[in-house]
Each structure stands twice: as C-alpha cells, then as structure tokens.
Regions:
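Hydrophobic, membrane-interfacing alpha helices
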Residues: 1-303
Length: 303
C-alpha cells in the first residue's frame, strides 16, 4: 500500500512558446535576478553608494552565476556526458534541435565559485571592497536560490530517496510510483529562512556591522543545509565513500565560512565599501555622463 503522499505532475513549462517555452526553472532564475537587483539597489541607496557600481556589478554577477553554475553542474555531476565530442556544445547551448529547453542543470557550488572569481575581478577594476559587497549580495542570493530550487520542483527534478512521510512527492511525470523526498522544496524553504534572517540582521544593524560577518555565517548556514539534505539525495554517490559528492563539495565552504566569520568578529577584514577610496577616474566619468543625460532631458522638456 502506497502511504499518504502528494501526487506531482506539473507541466515543467511555465510559458509555452511554439514547440518549447520558458520553463519554471528559467523563470525562477529571472525572478531571482529581478528581485535581487531591486533589493541590492535599495541597499546601495540606503548606504549612499553610487548606483553605477550596481549596474556594473549586475553584469558581472549574471555571467558569474550562469557560467559558474552551469560549468559546476557539468564538471561535478555529469562530466562523462558533457565533456565528450558529441555533447560538449550542450554545455551552453539551450536548444534541443529547434526547440528551446533552457539549462536543466545548474550547481550552487559552481555558482559560488563563479561569484567569488567575478568579485575578485570586479574589485580589481572598481576598487570596491569585495567583502562589503558579499555581505549584501549573499542576502539576495539566498532568495534567488529558493526560486531556483522551486523551479527544480516544478520541473520534477533533483528529488531524493523513497519516504513514507506524508509530504513525500510521487513525481508521476518521471514515471515514479513511490513517494520521494522533495529535496528541492526542503532547500527552498531553508534558503527562504536564511534570506529572512540575513535581511533581518542587515536591517536591524542598519548596514552597520563588521564586514564579513553576514557572508561568513551565510556560508556556514547555506552549505550546512546542503550537507544535511544530501543525506536523502541519490545523485552524486562516490564509490567507497559514505558522503555524497555534494557533501564533499560543501565542506570547504562551511570551513571557509567559519574562518571568515572569525576574522570578521576580530575586525580583521577591511571595513566599508571603499577602504582605499573610490576610483576617482570612474566617478568623474559617471558624473560627466549623468550631467550629459540631465542636460538632454532638460532640452527635451523645454521643447
């Protein structure tokens, strides 16, 4: 007898376009960036940081998360398939023949590495404190992660082992007949809680806290959750290991988070958005551009 469970058979395509369409997964990715931009823009405005820095940061983050998450999935979880002469183009090609299918494999570990590398490049160019940015950026990344994981649930993918718990999902679209742990839903709920606590702390401190403190504990919380949920997952098994691949990948981030939190508590990380001062050349360039746009609008309104 099948225990009480949720029968899940949702269409993975949220918006149909011809033979294909926009999947829930891709929609979640877009919502994550839209809401993330809105929230971080308010943080920058609240702390009197030039909005031009955010416009540049958005491009860096979009490319870092997309490329990092996609490469992370292909390298860590499906290397044997993608890195072959027949399938390597599929790494970044979102079409199956003439049908748009989007990207059906993104890894949070790869996204995290991509973000860190992109911020290093951003810091080199814009002279902005990467630790300060990370404290604010990870708040919205947790929200984005929740949307993406909900997209996984709607796509009937990344679920766990069999369960007799009443909230087990029978993923009928995949031909499943036994309830499974909805691990994507577990992660989405956990990420929403991490987002709520991080945002609450940021607002409570009014943005005035030791640099690196949110980022450090965020790493511990998010990848700690990933480590625990992996116990009821099935993909990523390593022969001869009691831990799954996702757990081994999470451990360095947890340890790194603890180290960063310790340095932050001791005040050993650079404080403020511009500890060495702003890039005066860029600031002057943006000011001239803003003045030019302002004059154009004035002339247009006077006509």
């Amino acid at each position: 007898m099948i225990p009480l469970a949720i029968h899940w058979n949702v269409d993975p395509i949220a918006i149909h376009i011809g033979d294909g369409g926009l999947r829930w997964y891709s929609l979640g990715f877009l919502l994550a960036f839209g809401l993330g931009y809105w929230l971080v823009s308010h943080m920058f405005k609240r702390e009197n940081v030039n909005s031009h820095y955010l416009d540049s940061l958005l491009l860096y983050m979009f490319l870092a998360i997309l490329i990092g998450a996609r490469l992370g999935h292909c390298l860590f979880y499906d290397f044997g398939y993608y890195f072959t002469a027949e399938h390597w183009l599929e790494i970044f090609w979102p079409f199956d023949g003439s049908r748009f299918v989007g990207y059906q494999g993104l890894a949070s570990h790869g996204a995290a590495i991509g973000i860190l590398l992109a911020l290093w490049l951003y810091w080199r160019k814009y002279n902005m404190n990467a630790w300060w940015i990370l404290d604010r950026l990870v708040i919205v990344v947790a929200l984005g992660g929740a949307f993406v994981r909900l997209g996984n649930v709607f796509n009937s993918e990344i679920y766990g082992t069999a369960t007799d718990l009443p909230w087990g999902f029978i993923f009928e679209r995949n031909g499943e007949t036994v309830p499974k742990h909805p691990t994507g839903l577990y992660e989405a709920i956990a990420y929403l809680l991490i987002f709520a606590v991080s945002l609450w702390y940021y607002l409570r401190k009014n943005g005035q806290f030791k640099t690196g403190s949110i980022f450090g504990w965020w790493l511990v919380a998010l990848f700690g959750v990933r480590f625990l949920i992996e116990f009821v997952k099935t993909n990523g098994a390593i022969e001869g290991s009691v831990l799954l691949k996702g757990q081994w990948l999470s451990i360095p981030f947890i340890v790194g988070g603890l180290v960063i939190a310790w340095f932050a508590a001791k005040g050993r990380l650079p404080q403020g958005p511009f500890p060495k001062g702003e890039n005066k050349v860029l600031v002057a360039k943006w000011a001239a551009s803003d003045e030019k746009d302002k004059n154009k609008k004035t002339k247009k309104n006077n006509k």
